[in-house]
Amino acid sequence: FAILGSSMPPVRPKNPEFSSGPCKKRPGYNVSKLRTDTLGRSHRSKVGKQRLKKAILDTKRILNIPEDYLCGIVPASDTGAYELAMWNMLGPKPIDACYWESFGQGWKTDAVTHLGLQDQLTEYTAPYGTLPDLASTNKDHDILFTFNGTTSGVKVLDLDWISDDRTGLTFN
């Protein structure tokens, strides 16, 4: 299941500036074109609130999100969105928390410590850098796991262990 080492890919990317950062910029990008009136200002300031509101409204418009749907900006990229989903969706079903690196362990800790779900949580863990037996998870439980363990260098190679007829939610 785990990729513990790495080998050089056979072809190099045309532009190596991709990943979680630095990211490849759009054609014609120039840092001097960025507005700086919010630099050093809190998101709670008048200008910060205005800028966030504009970004949210623009997002709704560009993505054609229905008027009666809510849209928001969540900090911390995927981590913030994952936490938001956990806090709003976990609870009705038992939880299988699968972790083998720091993000997954943090999400398990939040489910127990902050959400108080310890009585309905089963842990599937393995030493740092290896995967637990993911096939042992229950199709009727919600599952928490990190698909690409960036802190440990271990990723799940496939999702064959997730049942096609599952009734629980899958968080990854």
Question: What is each model feature region?
Answer:
Residues 1-46:
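N-terminal "arm"/small-domain region of PLP-dependent enzymes with the aminotransferase-like
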Residues 9-10, 64-66, 89-90, 135-138, ...:
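Solvent-exposed alpha-helices and their adjacent loops that cap or buttress functional pockets
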Residues 18, 71-75, 97, 122-123, ...:
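General beta-strand structural signal in soluble alpha/beta enzymes
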Residues 80, 88-143:
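PLP-dependent aminotransferase-like
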Residues 127-172:
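Active-site phosphate-binding strand-loop segment of PLP-dependent enzymes
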Residues 32-84, 100-110:
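Conserved N-terminal alpha-helix of the aminotransferase class I/II PLP-enzyme fold
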Residues 84-85, 110, 156-161:
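A short acidic, amphipathic alpha-helical/loop segment
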Residues 67-69, 116-121, 166:
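A short helix-to-beta-strand connector/capping loop
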